[in-house]
Amino acid sequence: QQFIEQEYAQIAWLRGESAETVCEHLEKAIAQTMPEAETQRKTGILSVEEYKLLLFRWEVCFGTDRERGEKELQELTEEIFQKNFERTERVKVIPYAALLKAKTSQDGKQDTYLKMITETALENLREEGKLLYMPEILKQYAKILEKENGDAEFIQLLRQERAGILE
């Protein structure tokens, strides 16, 4: 049932339906295995898929009247990094968390943290040979390095790598 509700939410999101509609499906999905999500997060018994679901809810609510807040995203990201997930599992959630973190780091705060999680995301993607999120992470990393006047050749290499993936 959780998977079905999550898929309904994703379809509604892709169709551009209201955040309210998408959130209704997400709340139903979350309730299937995380009826006490906040408590379960504190006890540390959530799976990667459950964290992805919580991140998706955060993304859907971002910029709406249902916004979950930057604090929740920070806490989710920190929890994900503290977990001892297998590499094959980490690659499913760390890049997503890094991309969402960039949405709240536009003002120049937490640049070091954003750089660290973006580097980790890129490393995980490369180690596992995954392309999902790779172009976005490469773009984000190049932007971060550019902002701090990083190595121009390396930044160009990141952009070329991204272009090669998108071709």
Predicted regions and their residues:
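Amphipathic alpha-helical repeat scaffolds of TPR domains
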Residues: Q2-L14, K42-T64, R90-T104
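Short, well-structured alpha-helical interface segments that form or flank functional binding sites
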Residues: F3, T21-E24, R90-K92, M116, ...
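Flexible helix-coil transition and linker loops at the boundaries of alpha-helical arrays
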Residues: Q1-Q2, A31-V48, E78-R90, L125-L131
